[in-house]
Amino acid sequence: MKANILKLLFLFCSVIVLSACDTDDDLPSSKVPETVKSAFDAKFPTVNRVEWEKKSGYYVAEFHENGVEMQTWFDADAVWCMTETDLRTDLNGLPGLVQNAFQTGEYADWRVDDIDKYERPAGVFYLIEIEKNGQKDRDLFYDENGNLLKDVVDTEKDTVLPNISFN
């Protein structure tokens, strides 16, 4: 009996600690500037359900469009900065040039953990997160033409900011 109570107490404390570790700053819609909400509505007029967060000074809308999980980022002046689309692990969601570059590249035998498409005013890029037993997970960034822009060890920090540079 005492062991069960201790297990429940441990579980309760774990839930409290883990929920306190959430680094996202959820934002009620009432705290999002009207200009940002209007910019979102203009860009995504068919989306009804939106959850807002504030990340690194950006207003981030999380939503689903046509069953696909997406995030879009606006700055404080309501200027659209980036949209992230979750392609899950389906290489077929990638342009042919990107698919081919990955499948014929150095990491072709690694397992794809996640794929995201990023659209910015400066253009589109793709992030393929990969893993392989005994190796550190990697993040591969490709442009639309299949050029590998960046190959880095995955830091477990899943946030790609709109101002990411490939230099």
How would you label these PLM feature ranges?
Residues 10-15:
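Hydrophobic helical h-region of N-terminal Sec-dependent signal peptides
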Residues 22-25:
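Bacterial signal peptide processing site
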Residues 29-167:
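First exposed extracellular module after export/assembly in secreted or surface-exposed proteins
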Residues 17-20:
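C-terminal motif of bacterial Sec signal peptides marking the signal peptidase cleavage site
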Residues 1-9:
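Bacterial N-terminal signal peptides that target proteins for export
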